[in-house]
Amino acid sequence: MPRLFVMLPAYNEERCLPPLLRAFQKLFAELPASYDPLIVIVDDGSQDRTARVARNAKKKGFPVELVKHERNKGLGEAIKTGLNRCLDHAEGPDDVIVCMDADNTHPPRHVVEMLETLRVEDADIVIASRYRWGSRQHGVPVHRQLMSLG
């Protein structure tokens, strides 16, 4: 059975992770039974209780693995660490890795569309972007949208 890895680089996301994990729990219940899901949370030296949230989710039986950086190394290193951990667990060519922000600004429901695109297009990679022409950002405060412009 192919694995579905959801890799979440996280820095001080104790408030955002619980609703995001609940959304993934709902999504996993709706996924075809052909995927074995695992969420890999990379806590990039958070100063809050991000790691505790991940550990508690695992204790409740949720498919979560926590990887912790002792100090903040930045988003790039968190992504690299997370991808390497997913690859350590990969079992075959049909495994899928989804990388999303842990701040709950990307609705997990889009994962289903991405999986369908992989299947229909026989693609190796699908990139979803809120910056694509005609796309919109939902749930992101205006000041954060402006900061993203550079």
What is each model feature region?
Residues 27-35, 57-61, 85-94:
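Alpha-helix termini
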Residues 8, 32-46, 67-68:
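Short beta-strand/loop segment that forms part of the nucleotide-sugar
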Residues 69-88, 94-99, 105-150:
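Acceptor/aglycone-binding surface of glycosyltransferases and processive sugar-polymer synthases
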Residues 1-5:
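Extreme N-terminal starter segment of soluble prokaryotic enzymes
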Residues 43-51, 104:
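A conserved acidic beta->alpha catalytic loop
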